[in-house]
């Protein structure tokens, strides 16, 4: 039903650290090959859920980063890898670290098809947003010099002649034109140091945005052409997210405790890490999927963003661990209540997929039949994460020595 309809998949899978960050009953100490199989099966299916312009964002730490990149390049295509984001989620670092004190984890972002992928024009950095200190009837903006100062020598007059032309300003600074007029000031893109550079746009393009240009006279008498940079243009999103809102202690652990009183959930993501990902990659009517729902941060983020921008995004969260399900459901119900949201939250339990195998095991009369059922289960059943298939197969002779009743157990 949802194949090809999901705009964003956000997942925070078990990191396979082998350390103290064990996530409840997840087997967080897989060997690399088992962990990769665990991930590959899910990611291969996940790709089919994405729309052609869809994205997947995967949180991971350094331990499996290299392995995961190789796997996701294979599934989604290296050409669709849009970025590896470093999220500073623990700015104080890990005091017990033997070598480097880790302050970040990572987020891999892939598109399903980069020909259709498009980021939203958003500003994720609060400090940058505060620089938009002007406002008119069209909204917030800030003034930027219209001279192209970046790009080194490439944007010098001698190397880009078509971007060197005069802009004319009326004596009262009220009118700006590209047509030469009597008594108008003639302004060229020359810096305060006398360097001849270029304007940001060609003459034809500048003609179309003259209404967004302002002339200012400095204390030194120099006239500058300034551009209204609109907040709607957003910003190029950097690959390092270091804003304090991404702190997983303040906006993950403590936030969850504040909402539902839970102090025992290990390392929930900062709400704003997920919220900003959803803000960047989805529209107001899109579907977001998270099949490692954990504490329900993704659902919470979607609800908060809908409240912020009036969107009608929907989320689907999938979780199989009882500890997580209880936390997740309670959190979403609380958020809906606290925000007086009219959104509905529907909770389903999947039909016991393995029930047919249980019935086959109970009805079998021969040990050989049990072994045949086991081979089918390895391919078709949903086995618990703690089941090590390889180890089970290594002890097959010991299994054969058991009585039929013991084998069924």
Predicted features along the sequence, with ranges:
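Accessory, often C-terminal, charged low-complexity segments
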Residues: 2-3, 7, 20, 42-47, ...
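Conserved proline-anchored active-site loop of SAM-dependent methyltransferases
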Residues: 4-21, 72, 288-303
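Mobile active-site "lid"/loop adjacent to the S-adenosyl-L-methionine
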Residues: 7-9, 13-37, 42, 51-53, ...
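Short coil/turn segments at secondary-structure junctions
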Residues: 26, 30, 94, 257-261
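Phosphate/oxyanion-binding active-site loops and adjacent basic polyanion-contact surfaces
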Residues: 31-39, 265-270, 324-326
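Conserved beta-strand signature within the Rossmann-like core of class I S-adenosyl-L-methionine
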Residues: 54-58
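Glycine-rich adenosyl-nucleotide cofactor-binding module
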Residues: 250-285, 304
């Amino acid at each position: 039903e949802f194949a090809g309809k999901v705009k964003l998949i956000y997942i925070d899978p078990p990191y396979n650290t082998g350390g103290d960050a064990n996530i409840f009953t997840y087997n967080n100490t897989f060997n690399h090959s088992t962990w990769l199989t665990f991930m590959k099966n899910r990611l291969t299916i996940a790709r089919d859920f994405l729309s052609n312009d869809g994205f997947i964002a995967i949180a991971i730490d350094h331990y499996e980063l290299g392995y995961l990149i190789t796997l996701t390049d294979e599934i989604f295509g290296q050409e669709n890898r849009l970025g590896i984001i470093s999220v500073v989620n623990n700015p104080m670092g890990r005091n017990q670290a033997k070598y480097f004190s880790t302050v970040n984890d990572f987020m891999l972002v892939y598109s399903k098809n980069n020909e259709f992928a498009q980021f939203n024009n958003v500003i994720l950095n609060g400090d940058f947003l505060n620089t938009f200190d002007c406002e008119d009837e069209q909204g917030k903006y800030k003034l930027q010099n219209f001279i192209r100062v970046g790009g080194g020598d490439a944007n010098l007059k001698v190397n880009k002649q078509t971007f060197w032309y005069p802009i004319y300003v009326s004596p009262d600074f009220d009118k700006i034109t590209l047509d030469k007029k009597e008594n108008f000031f003639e302004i060229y893109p020359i810096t305060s140091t006398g360097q001849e550079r270029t304007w940001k746009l060609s003459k034809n393009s500048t003609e179309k945005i003259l209404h967004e240009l302002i002339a200012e006279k400095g204390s030194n008498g120099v006239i500058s052409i300034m551009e209204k940079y609109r907040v709607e243009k957003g910003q190029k999103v950097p690959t390092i997210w270091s804003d304090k809102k991404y702190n997983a202690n303040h906006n993950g652990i403590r936030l969850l405790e504040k909402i539902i009183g839970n102090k025992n959930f290990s390392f929930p993501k900062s709400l704003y890490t997920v919220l900003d990902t959803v803000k960047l990659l989805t529209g107001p009517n899109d579907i977001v999927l998270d099949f490692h729902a954990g504490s329900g941060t993704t659902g919470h983020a979607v609800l908060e963003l809908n409240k912020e921008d009036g969107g009608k995004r929907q989320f689907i969260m999938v979780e199989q661990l009882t500890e997580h399900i209880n936390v997740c459901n309670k959190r979403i119900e609380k958020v809906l209540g606290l925000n007086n949201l009219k959104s509905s939250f529907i909770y389903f339990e999947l039909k016991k997929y393995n029930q047919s195998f249980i019935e086959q095991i109970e009805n079998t009369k021969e040990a050989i039949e049990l072994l045949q059922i086991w081979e089918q289960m390895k391919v078709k059943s949903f086995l618990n994460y703690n089941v090590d298939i390889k180890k089970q197969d290594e002890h097959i002779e010991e299994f054969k020595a058991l009585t039929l009743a013991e084998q069924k157990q």
